[in-house]
């Protein structure tokens, strides 16, 4: 396994797919990185030379990846919660943030149903 940006990427897959194992890199970004490094997308990771791996690492140095990116997103969410914005309140309450309906769905965000017992008449 080749180690790029602190992540072991699979050797038997194509380079484009392997790079997506790094948090913060999708398929489009992987294609752009390989184009800038001058490496074919169809190459397998096991066939890459050390020079090519170093070119990829140099390209990825300009991106915010893995721990830094995770930290930035969590700090952004924390900031929203501290300033008391609508989005921050939704995060704090564990509800959908982007305006989705919560009357029937949103079970992923709300967790399992908490049934309330009926009053006897």
UniProtKB/Swiss-Prot annotation:
Ranges of biased composition (kind: Basic residues): 106-121
InterPro entries named in the record: Rbsml_uS13_C, Ribosomal_uS13, Ribosomal_uS13-like_H2TH, Ribosomal_uS13_bac-type, Ribosomal_uS13_CS
Database matches in PROSITE patterns: RIBOSOMAL_S13_1, RIBOSOMAL_S13_2
GO cellular component, one term: cytosol
Entry's Gene Ontology BP terms: translation
Region (Disordered), start-end ranges: 91-121
Keywords recorded for this protein, A-Z: Ribonucleoprotein, Ribosomal protein, RNA-binding, rRNA-binding, tRNA-binding
UniProt GO MF annotations: rRNA binding; structural constituent of ribosome; tRNA binding
Gene3D superfamilies with a match to the protein in the record: 1.10.8.50, 30s ribosomal protein s13, domain 2 (4.10.910.10)
Keyword rRNA-binding: yes
Signal peptide: none
Function: Located at the top of the head of the 30S subunit, it contacts several helices of the 16S rRNA. In the 70S ribosome it contacts the 23S rRNA (bridge B1a) and protein L5 of the 50S subunit (bridge B1b), connecting the 2 subunits; these bridges are implicated in subunit movement. Contacts the tRNAs in the A and P-sites.
Entry similarity comment: Belongs to the universal ribosomal protein uS13 family.
Quaternary state and interactors: Part of the 30S ribosomal subunit. Forms a loose heterodimer with protein S19. Forms two bridges to the 50S subunit in the 70S ribosome.
Database matches in NCBIfam families: uS13_bact
Name of this chain's protein: Small ribosomal subunit protein uS13
Gene: rpsM
